[in-house]
């Protein structure tokens, strides 16, 4: 009996696939890439047609030895790495590292790790797609050239430890440009007017908004203008001029792409893109489900396609019919394909088995796995469901020369909202509106003028930044999360209450990049380069020609930057904590585990201290300050500033409220307070003044 070897990236994926194949199949993981460019040098021979100098990655010797041993025993080798550019490149590197040119081998791909998909991929085995490999090589070489040649300039001109990149530098520029828009924004005053009108037979007054006069809509820019209108309306009769009832359909959403999954997980679950991708990877590669073994729960997570297979569409609609009724089954919203942005080889992100509803496997998943899986499940089911139907009623009201409008919206049919109510939509307005007749006289109860000011553009969040990058065609599904992770890790931006704020360091880097490398941080140029990479994938352009056309101007820019750019001094954040060894005020520095305090007298004085943030709550055990800390793995917890003398520690934020049953301190859980004593278990609502309490951000050391 012939023996087959299947090589995948991860042990989890190997474990899931193994159960689908017979005893004559061995499945081994390469643990990601086995060859790459060297870290210590550029690794690209500029003079020799930009030839990459690949080396075996340090630490991969044992893995390759095991793989070579398995290859010798196998009659055929299947390279089953992920179905994208990166996966194709890993297979290509394995081909060379394992010397498969004289071996019977094939490349297989699947968008979901199911028995049907894996076995079908073996039936449709193929050669390595060199267009995909070359697209990955072009990206890798471009990114290496940009990063390795600009980063040392930033080290020399600003400070060490900085980096630049084709996508990360554009992302930083977008955030800086938005910050500038916000800073330059000048609020404009405007007013609105609402009339509260009594309707015969209704206890609740009708709320009608001023929309204009007989001829046109009007804008009110000052209190004087508003007072003129109020004076005119005194004593005027309010009469119903027309009632209009219309039906509106709200289409079901498209299933998730990588971008939209990251956006929704950020806004709904408060997951950073990096966390979303990590958990989605677990769901894709396989989770142990009782009675089923290791199961891949979702399709491939790096995709910009909203396409759904015929089989998955039919299975979802059958599930919807049984669970909700035939009237809830929809046609399924069809996406408009944009060739500039969509690589449509994959499906959208969806569940693999309709039998594994979130509720049925909740106990088998971690909390985060369940929440993300439920989000994916609900979105996919919603995409196959009927539209929601609204009954909209609009009442036009005349008051002399002015016109008011009252409206109500009633959900007539939930449709997809029954599983995926994005904005918690519900019926709004006075539902009695449609029963009001034309020419009905209404009694004025009150006129309520309100002053407003136009608002500046919103700060970017991780979700809105991902959306913008995708809209501009910058980066690909695999790059959004690491891009945001990099600019936050470099301290170019900080995240506060979901908003991304540029730091002084980020501004300095962005200004230098705009001055010396304008094209690198130009949105349109970066999008054009992405388009060229797509053309390489399609076999329309040779990958080295992309580099050849890019490099000459870039080389000149690097040479000019080295000569002409002046040094920029970034001042450290000085604290009121005094160094107990030399008496200087300590400054905030950043390390692998976040902030710490360091003496500015380095290297003469090497004193450092942990940096904590006060949360404005006295320690329940000793009365000292409770401070927010982090474990070495980055998990946040609350401790006492007097540690180690005081051993107080809590994973949840403690409250100043004492338990009314046992006197122990309470801890915050959502909008509730829970007694810290497990024996007590008392729960109560959080006092209003305790909600949304901000940390002071003061430096504390011990």
Task: Describe the role of every protein-language-model region.
Residues 82-83, 159-163, 245-254, 264-269, ...:
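Conserved short loop/turn motifs at secondary-structure junctions
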Residues 113, 117-195, 246:
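C-terminal or mid-to-C-terminal helical accessory/interaction module adjacent to the motor/catalytic core
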Residues 16-20, 66, 89-97, 117-121, ...:
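Alpha-helical scaffold elements adjacent to nucleotide-binding pockets in ATP/GTP-utilizing enzyme cores
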Residues 139-149, 167, 197-199, 248-260, ...:
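Core structural elements
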Residues 260-272, 466-476:
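Short helix-coil junctions and helix-kink-helix linkers
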Residues 1-140, 149, 212, 220-223, ...:
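Intrinsically disordered, low-complexity regulatory segments
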Residues 216-254, 440:
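Metal- or metallocofactor-binding catalytic centers and their adjacent structured scaffolds
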Residues 2-4, 16, 25, 151, ...:
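Basic, low-complexity terminal or inter-domain segments flanking catalytic cores
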